[in-house]
Swiss-Prot record:
Residues 872-888, 941-954 have a biased composition (Low complexity). It comes from Drosophila yakuba. Belongs to the FHIP family. This is FHIP family protein GE18198. Residues 800-827, 865-888, 911-954, 968-995 are annotated as: Disordered. The lineage of its organism: Eukaryota, Metazoa, Ecdysozoa, Arthropoda, Hexapoda. The keyword Glycoprotein does not apply.
Length: 1050
């Protein structure tokens, strides 16, 4: 135990030259119990003679007593070390005591006499108090709880603790005091029945000290005091080990409040811990950097490595994690008080103004940096906290309209999705990815569902399909067909065909295209430069399916805890509920009087009615299987529809009651605060307006997302990574409304903006028009794909390298107890997936961009070939630390795709259409990548497509869009780095390799070629879109299975 080592070390190091203190204390042959007892008594006798002096003690007197106490502590340590059990004075019936020195200490009240003398030592009081604390620390650590039951030990201990309140001690004395308090908390946690020993009336205690002549008269209004907790409060915000030990002890006290209501009442009503924690948290937040230094082009969130590198952020996160732990373990009164103080004293007055920053004067760039830092801090907070109470407070903060003059924080965040600044846009999308990962009902309602529930964005003829999932609909094929033609052609060339296999292609064969052979960048073994890529997830549909199944199941579990089930229903207009109920009652009376069992007959007639082809629309409603009046044909029997609606209305009313009754038992922070009836009648307008078709809005959030998606080919690569990841996050929700919007190709959408499927078709047409299927286009696609795959393995290798770091080991030790088993299951699952991907042969490609001698090359291929030949002739390459050759053309190709060549030749600083900045430099500074490590419990998936998602939580790396996208988690909270991933500085292209001058000239020619920059952007977009569509196809397939299963259980 570290406590025992600390106490032993402390005793051994505080001596004044005594020889016994330097010798081993566990050698049984070195000490005679009788001799130890005699020596102990002799030392006390000499010390007591000094104590009995009537004059104030001098310096020599204090040194003498401290020296004797030093020897006494050593003798006690020797005795206790060899005693298996501490013998108490009252327990000795016969025979010699097992611990005679300890018995003498208690029977003669040595501790009480020592305390009384220490109060008279004046300026030497701290030195004497230090020796006393060492003595108590020794006895508590070795005797556990037995001595606390005896007054000769407990009484002077309470006295010295009470006298320490409000005092300012030197560091060594503070350290000993906090260690002693920590030990007492551990003992009390194991022996809760001793808690009342440390509750004493301050009035009684002070009066008792007045009788001894020690302190001034007490103040009026003194109450019961928990002395241990009171002494720990001043150290709650201390740095270093002292603060950590104090916070650990305070958490033990908070946990004790769950077992003893007196502790909880005292902390909540009489202590100042809650306002102290909140004010300290606000002060630490104010010390955070106003702008974060962004060292890479793809930076989008704060990682654990960033926290350790910024001391102010480390202190803030320590305080935040302590507040989260207090809410987790404390008494309900303490928890509620802390949450109220957090919301009123930190979240609203501190975070609110920091996030709602606006442009002021000429400080636009500074303001953008401040917004980025504030949103990054909010994202870090949401990923770090785990308690539902705190999460509920932050959700309330995002949706509050009263605290900020009618402006909601959530609306301000949505507006920043349209920001032209790439960094602000990526940080905003990363924040929304964290928010969507919370699976919170209120957030989803405000962002999406309240705009989709009326169903006005779907034509009337298609609305019956929203809740009804067709098991034979192949949405996966729809998404695969949206892949750009150049990507389809590349797949056809990469697919090894059998001799007897007919060639089926929807493309017109081009005579100039090469023969259908496999490219070196396709398959599971892209190892042209010696990099093992057998575990590549590129184009691994099994990995996509596994990831989709895992994510959808996780999301479904959380959504089952919601208060409302969000399915499309046609609700009555305002004020029509009573009219409909009255009409139904009249119909019931009519059929009961004249019908003679009409209900059963009507149910049979309804089944026959639903079987008609022309009236199939009404059968699609899952909630109400009756035909609304405004959708019925004139030939429909009104009586049948009315009777059927009555039966189903009663059924749905009972189902709604059961849902609302069970919602109180679910996680409150995930569930909505709105009652369903209030939501329907007050917040949402479900009236049917046929003239509103084509002008219905899906809400500002989806409009912003669709707007960004429409500029897909002009966005930067990293913005597109986060954008596709965010849409994929939405596609994981197993809700029919969201499923019909994103993954249903058979449902038309009529809104004021193009639908998701329409935008995808437009992007396909744009890429097909600007990047036709030619040999040069296939070469560019091949190079783009190779660079993305290479980055996937570079990130994977960086993760493996980080796994060997001490920081990673410490983090893994903390996560091992919670996620070891789950990680093992995921690794085995992915090992199966990797094994299922066979290693393929890679025959030479006729359009291989790495081939050095081919006279048929045109445009880009000629430039690459000449570049390679000049590179080989120069023979000036060096070998980088990662083992890949710097003389290879890979770094130059990466520079070609990142625009670094123009920088290397000294071009002016510019910013391309995708938002990538190019600095004016001759050293060649290029973009760096962001390495991330997978969170516990989250699989690594996505081929070159993994999402930029967090967890959190709970946030994790396994997700949607490319492995190039970076992410961290959590909440629970993953480790990543924002600097160079190859062990060197964060400079260079994708491979962080230096470029030579002769290669610079070649790259300058390529970069200046007309259309080259646009072509490379389109190539990256095509590869990204192709992989994203594969992932959407996998999600659509898994969602259909989940929703069809759910539909069958209704």
């Amino acid at each position: 135990m570290w406590l025992r080592q600390s106490s032993g070390g402390g005793v051994a190091s505080a001596g004044h030259g005594g020889p016994l203190r330097q010798r081993p204390i566990d050698a049984a042959t070195d000490c005679d119990p009788r001799a130890c007892y005699d020596s102990f008594c002799k030392h006390w006798q000499q010390a007591f003679e000094i104590i009995q002096h009537s004059a104030p003690p001098s310096h020599d007197d204090v040194l003498g007593v401290v020296s004797h106490l030093d020897y006494m502590v050593t003798l006690l340590l020797v005795e206790l070390h060899h005693c298996n059990k501490v013998s108490l004075p009252a327990a000795e019936a016969s025979g010699p005591p097992a611990a005679p020195c300890l018995e003498f200490l208690l029977s003669e009240n040595l501790l009480d006499k020592l305390y009384e003398w220490a109060c008279t030592t004046g300026r030497y009081a701290n030195a004497v108090r230090l020796e006393q604390l060492k003595l108590y620390e020794l006895l508590v650590s070795h005797s556990r709880h037995q001595l606390l039951c005896h007054e000769p030990f407990l009484r002077p201990l309470l006295k010295i603790l009470a006298s320490s309140q409000g005092e300012i001690f030197p560091p060594d004395l503070e350290k000993r005091l906090v260690i002693l308090l920590n030990q007492l908390c551990v003992v009390l946690m194991q022996n809760v029945h001793l808690l009342d020993l440390f509750f004493f009336s301050a009035q009684t205690q002070v009066q008792e000290q007045i009788l001894n002549g020690n302190v001034a008269p007490p103040k009026s209004g003194t109450t019961t005091n928990f002395i241990i907790f009171s002494l720990l409060i001043p150290y709650v915000h201390r740095e270093g080990s002292l603060g950590h030990q104090a916070r650990d002890a305070l958490l033990l006290c908070m946990a004790l409040s769950q077992k003893n209501s007196n502790i909880g009442t005292y902390i909540a009503q009489y202590s100042s811990i809650c306002p102290l924690l909140v004010t300290g948290l606000g002060g630490l937040y104010s010390r955070l950097p106003n702008s974060i230094e962004i060292s890479s082009i793809d930076w989008h969130r704060i990682t654990p490595d960033d926290v350790t590198e910024i001391p102010e952020l480390t202190l803030f996160m320590n305080a935040l994690e302590f507040c989260n732990a207090v809410v987790q373990v404390a008494h309900e009164m303490i928890k509620q008080q802390l949450l109220d103080f957090m919301y009123q004293g930190f979240i609203v007055p501190v975070l609110g103004p920091a996030i709602l920053q606006t442009l002021k004067g000429k400080h636009f760039q500074t303001n953008i940096d401040s917004q980025i830092s504030a949103m990054s801090y909010l994202d870090l907070i949401l990923r770090s906290i785990t308690e539902p109470g705190l999460l509920r407070a932050f959700v309330r903060f995002l949706l509050d309209t009263e605290k900020f003059d009618g402006e909601r924080i959530l609306d301000a965040l949505v507006e920043r999705l349209n920001s032209p600044d790439a960094n602000l846009c990526m940080v905003t999308m990363a924040l929304f990815d964290t928010l969507l990962g919370l699976h919170c009902e209120d957030l989803m309602l405000e962002l999406l569902l309240k705009f989709m529930l009326p169903g006005k964005h779907v034509p009337i003829s298609h609305r019956h399909k929203i809740n009804k999932i067709d098991p034979y609909l192949n949405s996966s094929e729809f998404f695969l067909d949206l892949s750009p033609d150049v990507m389809k052609r590349a797949r056809d060339l990469a697919r090894p065909k059998s001799v007897h296999e007919p060639v089926v292609s929807d493309l017109t064969p081009l005579p100039s295209l090469p023969s259908p052979v496999m490219s070196k960048t396709i398959g599971a073994n892209w190892n042209y430069y010696g990099v093992h890529t057998g575990d590549s997830l590129y184009a691994n549909i099994q990995a996509y399916l596994f990831e989709a199944h895992w994510r959808i199941a996780q999301c479904q579990r959380d959504c089952l805890k919601w208060a409302n089930s969000y399915r499309y229903q046609k609700w009555p207009r305002h004020g029509q509920g009573r009219v409909h109920a009255h009409a139904l009652e009249l119909a019931r009376q009519f059929f009961s009087e004249f019908g003679g069992g009409p209900i059963a007959a009507n149910e049979t007639s309804e089944k026959q009615l639903d079987s008609l082809q022309s009236i199939g629309e009404s059968s699609g409603y899952e909630s109400f299987k009756w035909r609304p009046a405004d959708e019925e044909s004139e030939a429909t029997d009104t009586t049948l529809a009315t009777t059927a609606s009555e039966a189903d209305l009663d059924h749905n009313s009972s189902s709604l009651s059961s849902v609302l009754g069970a919602s109180s038992k679910r996680e409150a922070w995930r569930t909505s605060n709105n009652n369903r009836n209030e939501l329907i009648l007050t917040d949402l307008e479900f009236s049917e307006d046929l003239f509103a078709q084509g002008t219905v809005s899906l809400g500002p959030f989806l409009n912003a997302i669709w707007g960004k998606l429409q500029t897909f080919t002009s966005n930067s690569l990293y913005v597109n990574l986060h954008l596709t990841g965010l849409i994929t996050r939405l596609a994981w929700y197993p809700l029919p409304l969201i499923h019909s919007l994103l993954l249903r190709s058979d449902i038309a959408i009529t809104s004021d903006t193009p639908s998701f499927h329409q935008v995808l078709r437009i992007l396909k047409q744009q890429i097909d028009a600007e990047l036709p299927v030619t040999e040069d286009s296939l070469e560019i696609i091949d190079v783009a794909r190779s660079s993305l795959i290479d980055r996937e393995f570079r990130l994977a290798n960086a993760r493996k390298g980080n796994e060997g770091s001490p920081m990673h080991h410490s983090q893994q030790q903390q996560m091992a107890t919670n996620s070891g088993q789950q990680q093992g299951q995921l690794r085995s699952a992915y090992a199966t997936l990797s094994a299922a991907t066979p290693v393929q042969a890679t025959p030479t490609s006729a359009y291989d961009p790495f081939k050095r001698s081919d006279n048929k090359r045109r445009s880009i291929s000629k430039s690459i070939t000449s570049m390679f030949s000049r590179k080989s002739a120069s023979n000036t390459s060096t070998t980088p630390p990662n083992g890949s050759s710097a003389s290879s053309g890979l770094s130059q190709i990466y520079a070609f795709f990142t625009g670094a060549a123009s920088n290397l030749v000294g071009t002016n600083a510019s910013t391309d259409g995708r938002g990538m900045s190019h600095a004016q430099t001759s050293a060649g500074t290029c973009e760096t990548s962001l390495s991330t490590q997978p969170q516990a419990g989250a699989p690594r998936t996505g081929a070159i497509a993994t999402s930029a998602t967090a967890s959190g939580s709970n946030s994790s790396i396994a997700g949607s869009t490319l492995t190039l996208s970076a992410q961290s988690n959590t909440t629970t909270h993953s480790a990543s780095t924002l600097h160079g991933l190859d062990g060197g500085p964060s400079t260079g292209g994708f491979n962080s390799e230096p470029a030579s001058l002769d290669s610079v000239a070649s790259m300058g020619i390529i970069a200046s070629t007309s259309g080259t920059e646009r072509s490379r952007d389109l190539a990256l977009c095509a590869v990204l879109m192709d992989e994203w569509l594969k992932e959407l196809a996998a999600i659509a397939q898994e969602q259909s299975v989940v929703l069809v299963t759910e539909q069958g259980s209704l």
